Amino acid sequence: MFSILKKIFGTANDRTIKKLFSDIAKINSLEPAIQKLSDEELKNKTVEFKKKLKNGATLDDIAYEAFAVVREASRRVYGMRHFDVQLIGGLVLHRGMITEMRTGEGKTLVATLPAYLNALAEKGVHVVTVNDYLVSRDSASMGKIYNFLGLSVGCIVAGMTDEAKREAYNSDITYATNNELGFDYLRDNMKYSLQERVLRPFNFAIIDEVDSILIDEARTPLVISGPVNDNSELYGKVDKLVRMLNVSDFEKDEKLKTINLTESGISHVESLLSQADIIKPNSGLYDFENLSLVHYVNQALRAHNMFMIDVDYLVRDGKVMIIDEFTGRVMEGRRYSEGLHQALEAKENVKIQNENQTLASITFQNYFRNYPKLSGMTGTAMTEAPELKDIYNLDVVAVPTHNKVTRRDLDDEIYGSKKEKYDAILKLIKDCYDRGQPVLVGTVSIEKSEEISNVLNKNKIPHKVLNAKFHEQEAFIIAQAGRFKAVTIATNMAGRGTDIMLGGNPEMLIEQIDRKSLTNAAYKEKVNEIKAQTAEEKKQVIAAGGLFVIGTERHESRRIDNQLRGRSGRQGDPGNTKFFLSLDDDLMRIFASERISGVLRTLGLKDGEAIHHPMISRSLEKAQQKVEGHNYEIRKNLLRFDDVMNDQRKIIYEQRTEIIKSKDSYDFLSSTTEELAKKIVLTFMPAGSYREDWDIENLSVELHRTFAIKLDQNLISKNDVTEEEVTKIVIQTADSIYKSKEEAYSPDLMHNAVKYILLTTLDQVWKDHLHSLDHLRQGISLRAYAQKDPLSEYKREAFNLFEHMLNNLKELFIQTVYHFHIDLKHIQKEDISLENKKLQNNMHESREDPAFSKYNAGSNLETDLRPVISRINPEDRDPKNPTSWGKVSRNELCPCGSGKKYKYCHGLNE
């Protein structure tokens, strides 16, 4: 019934496309007039559009003409005229939606249309992609079109200076990776002046490979972190003990990816820990004093039993490097959190890096939701359309191809074992190779790609391997995968963003020529030779059937399978795709084994035989849908929790910006002084209480600790004195202390000093707050056992922690302001600035990367704004000797190593 209605009325997507074609007719009607313009007149259209916008026109008012201008500029610069379907893709992007366009349909060129149009508003446009290679390539190639029309183009890649980044972000259109954008946002919110920031306010972003960024990478946060206590020795000891455990000592659930000790396992671990003198004899793993060890044991168990080398990570240059499960690429600089990375380093016997404490973090989900207008493009988005709508409020429009797809997607073949599957794959590759048909073999991990490579080596079939170990050659290898007799093994979707052209990519082959060693004539001859060779090979490859894509197993996500299929059949080229499966494959074994095994037993599968059955295909699709649904729920749940932190982060970042912008910090100082003075006085002199109930001694101590005030005992001895009068005197005395500092150091110097103290204190308490939230998140799921909703509990406690953080901020800020002094012998007035470059230069960022310790970075202000009681470098403190600790902040972890805050440990009686 539903299918009949679809045939009559069409799908919602069909109706959207039909409406868009009427818009395209309007753009096409402008083309003859635009073509008659000279180059200079075409460039002046940009100036004309900007004037219209300033006079009240909207982007939609000029959209059709702007698109026609870009199309003509592209034709003149590159000889490439946007197809009608590319104009549709551009309109979809301009209207803040996601466009699904097949591989080879020219998404890079499509982005020029909305990028140019939206850049006319002079608020900046970000074109986002997944790696530095694509950023450099696309900004250089498409930049010629923008430059022709008088717009500037910037390019952001790793390793650039702040000055270079600022210039790039101030361009009309900026190409950047998602990682660099996210880290620049976090870094900007750790800067000490607006002039030092590199980003402009958020405006419009176009995300290439949008599914990879907004879905595949949504669970991993961007993190700027700093080192905490060194526990590398303990990770090493626990790792040795975990290696001695038996299979019966733990239970693992591959579906949920969890692992837990059994009762016998706990006893075994306790025995091993006792023998190693890590815990006392006869004490238990879950005894209070040993609870911290549970974390180390659990992470070591996960490292040894849930994470595999060359599948989840690899070891390169003595470092454990994470492999992206969706792309097969190495995730440079990223580290697993919560000690898992250290456990993997212990497992692989490489140097164990310190654990990190989060200083700033954000997920891509929340970063990209900062843009008032967001759009994206990819070859595969329809399967994830509900999630993109639900989380990002982005609709997906599938744009028809310019040429009809002639690729044939063949039925899956299912075998009883991996060996039988590999034999069948080998047979097909041999057949294709003998006929000259290029083959792309897609695998789900480095381990699998190397297994296939070994099979081909044994059978003397030449081939290229593309996986995380050969990331540098990625674009070139994948671009030449369509050559005659080429056999390429690729991990998942490595090489996305680079087209596979039948016969080879002549441009990339030309780039390999050593031009310096050739004369101009010889170079031209070589170029013509390459072009002729690739053209001839293209004819041979088409005759052989085009690119044959072989999938070695189904991925957890149907979208990834579709991406692999989409490698073949670009722009109407011929091609074939086929998946080979076995009962040993992870997806089959974990999610669909019982059902499918029953079918195979019924059908009587014999060794070496393949089977095709609709029920098996349906079971596989259901298994994939089940996993997709599970992963979606994880991402959705992550967002619910992250939204709590995101709301708090927005408040802190907005406050931080206001502090930096403020011309006078005295108002905040004055109001906070008044608030704390009232609070302290009422604590020790409660309103309406009797004089004998007043705690004058501790009031004096607290006022001196907070405001550096010595309380006049004669004042308190007056019979008629009230708490209001004492409060008033405290406020006046504190104000006079501040005014005397202004006279001694100058108002400007004091203003900058107070502002700096406020910013550094805010950064410190925010860092501690993030640490507290991390701990809260780790254990909050256990509240479900008490019939409580973990999310509601997290929201409630996170709010309480946030209030506590704000109170700490006020106390620490006031204490520092009233106690510090400036050594004018070592500082000039012009040295008091908030730029603090040394601090910024010591920042490092990662997806859990070792970073910096803020108070070790050093700056003019840090060395010369000395508190009355100096602070000792934490590394120089002896845990057993409190006299070596110097001044310890009440909210710092106690130097004794107890894990408690100082005010609840050795500072309890201060």
Swiss-Prot record:
Q: Which residues bind Zn(2+)?
A: 894, 896, 905-906
- Which GO terms are recorded in the biological process aspect for this UniProt protein? intracellular protein transmembrane transport; protein import; protein targeting; protein transport by the Sec complex
Q: Which cofactor does it need?
A: Zn(2+)
Record membrane topology: Peripheral membrane protein
Q: What's its catalytic activity?
A: ATP + H2O + cellular proteinSide 1 = ADP + phosphate + cellular proteinSide 2
| GO cellular component terms listed in the entry, alphabetical order | cell envelope Sec protein transport complex; cytosol; plasma membrane
Keyword ATP-binding listed: yes
Instruction: Specify the superkingdom.
Output: Bacteria
Key words of the record: ATP-binding, Cell inner membrane, Cell membrane, Cytoplasm, Membrane, Metal-binding, Nucleotide-binding, Protein transport, Translocase, Translocation, Transport, Zinc
Cystines in this chain: none
**What Pfam family is a match, any one?**
P-loop_SecA
Q: Does the keyword Isomerase apply?
A: no
Cofactor binding note: May bind 1 zinc ion per subunit.
EC number, UniProt record: 7.4.2.8
Per UniProt, ATP binds at: 86, 104-108, 499
| Location(s) in or outside the cell | Cell inner membrane; Cytoplasm
Return one GO MF term: ATP binding
Q: Which SMART domains match?
A: SecA_DEAD, SecA_PP_bind
* Cross-referenced InterPro entries: Helicase_ATP-bd, P-loop_NTPase, SEC_C_motif, SecA, SecA_CS, SecA_DEAD, SecA_motor_DEAD, SecA_preprotein_X-link_dom
How is the subunit organization of this protein annotated in UniProt?
Monomer and homodimer. Part of the essential Sec protein translocation apparatus which comprises SecA, SecYEG and auxiliary proteins SecDF-YajC and YidC.
Database matches in NCBIfam families: PRK12904.1 (NF009538), secA (TIGR00963)
Q: Which family does it belong to?
A: Belongs to the SecA family.
Cited function: Part of the Sec protein translocase complex. Interacts with the SecYEG preprotein conducting channel. Has a central role in coupling the hydrolysis of ATP to the transfer of proteins into and across the cell membrane, serving both as a receptor for the preprotein-SecB complex and as an ATP-driven molecular motor driving the stepwise translocation of polypeptide chains across the membrane.
Q: What is this protein called?
A: Protein translocase subunit SecA
Per the UniProt record, the source organism is Rickettsia bellii (strain RML369-C)
